[in-house]
Amino acid sequence: MHTGRYFAKNSYYDRTFNKQAVKILPGEYHATDSDTMIVTVLGSCVSVCIRDRLSGIGGMNHYMLPGEAGTDESPSPRYGTHAMELLIDHLIQLGGRLPYLEAKVFGAGRVINGVTDVGERNAEFALRYLEEREIPVTAVDVGDIYPRKVYFAPATGRAFVRQIRTGSIDSLFIGESS
């Protein structure tokens, strides 16, 4: 399957979870049908984790700005609309089915003082997009002033979020549902 230039391939062995992991950067996404952890770090950006709850096929995107931009010939996954379409299309190519998709939304921190709250707009976009497509949202961790590191295990549907605070790291467990 052709994965395209925005498909994250930066894989490594994650010692925290003792499994293979893929790190995604802004403007990238990853989708998988294997037991792979997907990881990213977010400030004002948003990551949406989507999985087929029956098959365990799932993935994560990482977009920087809400809505659409670019030309029709060159849409960019740095923008929410294209990031969501790329991820959902790839999940379906792997065998995921729209009626069984569910989502978790993370990020949208207000990490830079005095700047327009792009994080809030990013989160609003994600939640509106998912509602319009009737994809249920099972967990949300957005806002606040801290960056986050997000770990997503599509096979189980579990997500782990670590808020990155100056001088300490507080861990949160998000999304107990499988």
From Swiss-Prot:
GO biological process, one term: chemotaxis
SUPFAM superfamilies: CNF1/YfiH-like putative cysteine hydrolases (SSF64438)
Top EC class for this record: hydrolase
Pfam families noted in UniProt: CheD (PF03975)
Xref: InterPro entries: CheD-like_sf, Chemorcpt_Glu_NH3ase_CheD, Cytotoxic_necrot_fac-like_cat
EC number: 3.5.1.44
Catalytic activity as recorded in UniProt: L-glutaminyl-[protein] + H2O = L-glutamyl-[protein] + NH4(+)
GO molecular function ontology, one term from the record: protein-glutamine glutaminase activity
Family per record: Belongs to the CheD family.
NCBIfam families: PRK13487.1
UniProt cross-references to PANTHER family, sorted A to Z: CHEMORECEPTOR GLUTAMINE DEAMIDASE CHED-RELATED (PTHR35147:SF2)
Name of the protein in question: Probable chemoreceptor glutamine deamidase CheD 1
Organism in which the protein naturally occurs: Geobacter metallireducens (strain ATCC 53774 / DSM 7210 / GS-15)
Name of the gene: cheD1
